[in-house]
Amino acid sequence: MEGFNPADIEHASPINSSDSHSSSFVYALPKSASEYVVNHNEGRASASGNPAAVPSPIMTLNLKSTHSLNIDQHVHTSTSPTETIGHIHHVEKLNQNNLIHLDPVPNFEDKSDIKPWLQKIFYPQGIELVIERSDAFKVVFKCKAAKRGRNARRKRKDKPKGQDHEDEKSKINDDELEYASPSNATVTNGPQTSPDQTSSIKPKKKRCVSRFNNCPFRVRATYSLKRKRWSIVVMDNNHSHQLKFNPDSEEYKKFKEKLRKDNDVDAIKKFDELEYRTLANLPIPTATIPCDCGLTNEIQSFNVVLPTNSNVTSSASSSTVSSISLDSSNASKRPCLPSVNNTGSINTNNVRKPKSQCKNKDTLLKRTTMQNFLTTKSRLRKTGTPTSSQHSSTAFSGYIDDPFNLNEILPLPASDFKLNTVTNLNEIDFTNIFTKSPHPHSGSTHPRQVFDQLDDCSSILFSPLTTNTNNEFEGESDDFVHSPYLNSEADFSQILSSAPPVHHDPNETHQENQDIIDRFANSSQEHNEYILQYLTHSDAANHNNIGVPNNNSHSLNTQHNVSDLGNSLLRQEALVGSSSTKIFDELKFVQNGPHGSQHPIDFQHVDHRHLSSNEPQVRSHQYGPQQQPPQQLQYHQNQPHDGHNHEQHQTVQKDMQTHESLEIMGNTLLEEFKDIKMVNGELKYVKPED
């Protein structure tokens, strides 16, 4: 083998075995770099033939245990002059397995055989390799610039042929030598014999670095002392320029001449075809192999698998692993490349996270249960059906256990539901919205159970939002609304205490009944006209049935009370603002039995007929001794059977007459409620047309 062989270090001086942590290898270097190049070009003698005759300096390389060779990684991490101590931590942080290891690599006899082998692989891809720096154990190749400056082209045209030949020789030295010294060193083409020859030779200028020739692509070849083999790693597979095969370059011509000397017929045929396709502007076929990860493609060139070089970057300032002396921030931004043999590696550049779908908030709001809850009112107005069938919807019965229908107290239009629709809920009273009304036969003594039979009547009379097609009010038996007038047990106790006793004077009984009627009139602020009409009928009926002689005086008092009541109702009606406060809550009519027992009056089983002015007199004589009303039979059953005297019979007649007066009042109200209609969300009394 010609030239320097790293295996010759075995013939060096003996190793100092006293130091167990480090090994010192002493070997002889050539005289100078120029002699090494001349001998390498002319088929020179081996430098290891006579190491003692060469007066060369001795270089000692210390390999510590922490920087020992790793057979699994196939990478030798020796310290170079550019890898200073301040940048060692960057090298340790790098994962060497992420680099692209070329495999299989032949057993090179000399490091000069590495470049032709790499050129045969990378030339078909449009990559022209030159040596960036080289030493005994490592050679770094870079991608040569595709363009040159205009001044360099002009100078090259003006130069004579002899000077151009000298520039080519200096160019060879520039490509194959390492600039270890930062000072302006002089490079000669021959041995250094005299100082006159040294002064006559001009110093070589370094090649200018621009954005056209600063490509981050690097290939590193390192020699392993243990394995006695070379390992080649692609450290950065990015390029700052477009890749294009150039058959007219000087490097390619030298490479082609080397192939002819080696008699590599197959490689010559492939490159001849490559030249023809390039000159004819034909596409260059590449043997593409999909990667195991499924994200990248690979190229097989001369039995070596490489990743594609399609990721060409436009920036020329990206750093590499080999140039660790550059800015550390740029080195940290360099992307790690996947290994060819590593099947678990994934190229994260091609992985894209799926975009999250943009959700429409209006669509989500329309799916809420509040929309179905509020649109019941609008559907009811169109169809005219009661809310009993629409009440058992899944949007409402899923989380509320009470059968109470809230649509009857929410007069909010919900055709287009939004959050700003329900803005003010202070007008609605949700006091007992989630409390069920107890069963009437449960046996409890709660004050509400006394009036359970009248709940249906009150819901029918005062259901403002439940109407049918004829604008008649309907109500359910369990729909019970509490009003601000009768919402406590104290109001019930006042009504119970105001009932007439068993034995009482007829005049006092009539006065107390009048007070009850006044209480009822004060609690109703909407129906002043028909209440005034009813008071006239009830007053005439009571005087005709009881037979009081002072009818004229009492009628005057009644008319005076009626006028005062009408004025008070008109004043109170002007103070009412919203329709929700105008809803009647409860209407209870109580009658005491002969022994103080309280009996609710059922208005559902009576004849609902409109009473004329003379009808109370007919109704007073309707029931005779042969035909008694149902309430009178009930009172006879409650009386003791030991005897019936004349006083008890008169008391029963008085109670019956009082009961009939209350019954007439209830029937009249039921008939008069048909004249109440909903106008602009409010209850209005409409006079019947004659």
From Swiss-Prot:
Residues binding Zn(2+) 1, per UniProt: D110
Residues holding DNA: K111, K115, I131, E132, R133, S134, D135, K138, K226, N263
Compartment(s): Nucleus
Skewed-composition ranges (Polar residues): 181-201, 339-351
Bias (Basic and acidic residues) ranges: 160-174, 639-649
Chain span(s) of sequence motif CDC [2Fe-2S] cluster binding motif: 291-293
Annotated Gene Ontology cellular component terms: cytoplasm; nucleus
Molecular function terms from GO: cis-regulatory region sequence-specific DNA binding; DNA-binding transcription factor activity, RNA polymerase II-specific; kinetochore binding; metal ion binding
Written domain comment of the UniProt record: The CDC motif is involved in iron-sensong via binding to Fe(2+) or [2Fe-2S] cluster, which leads to dimerization and loss of DNA-binding.
Protein's name in the database: Iron-regulated transcriptional activator AFT1
Gene source species: Saccharomyces cerevisiae (strain ATCC 204508 / S288c)
Upper taxonomic lineage: Eukaryota, Fungi, Dikarya, Ascomycota, Saccharomycotina
Gene name tied to this protein: AFT1
